[in-house]
Amino acid sequence: TALAAVPAEKAVPVKQAAVVTEAPVVQPDLGPRRSVAFIGSECYPFVKTGGLGDVMYALPKALAKLNLDVKVILPRYKCIPQKFQEKMEYRGSFYMNLCSDGKQYYVGIMEYQEDGVVYDFIDNDEFFSWGNPYTNLIDDIPKFCYFAKASLAALNYLDWTPDVVHCHDWQAA
């Protein structure tokens, strides 16, 4: 069918649509990028015996998504699955004293990155070559004293000074 022409006197004027311009979104000035170091004895998927492993996995990932500079420091246990061990990269090593007896202890640093999070593993066969992260208090106390001190020394060695150092549980404190 053909459309009939409408006489000009009966035509309804069409209003032009208003042009809407959106105000530009102004991002708040958040200042410099913040950095957080998480130090703990376990973290999924590398090693997990309880809830600490879940927290050490989820919290750093969530903060990395918010654009924080995040680093997780863990012991390099021999029980960490090989698929992670073979992807770790050597970052360096040094020696430190643990107490006033003058004995120097090796501190190796191996790095693994995933989902915007840097995982630095403290390597020392004397303390971390056992099958389980936790053995008994007689062995665990010196092992985790070493780990806590080596973790802080590793931050210095890597020349990275975080805004926050979050130590999880007694093993890192």
Question: Which residues fall in each region the model found?
Answer:
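Catalytic cores of nucleotide-sugar-dependent glycosyltransferases that transfer UDP/GDP/TDP-activated
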Residues: 1-173
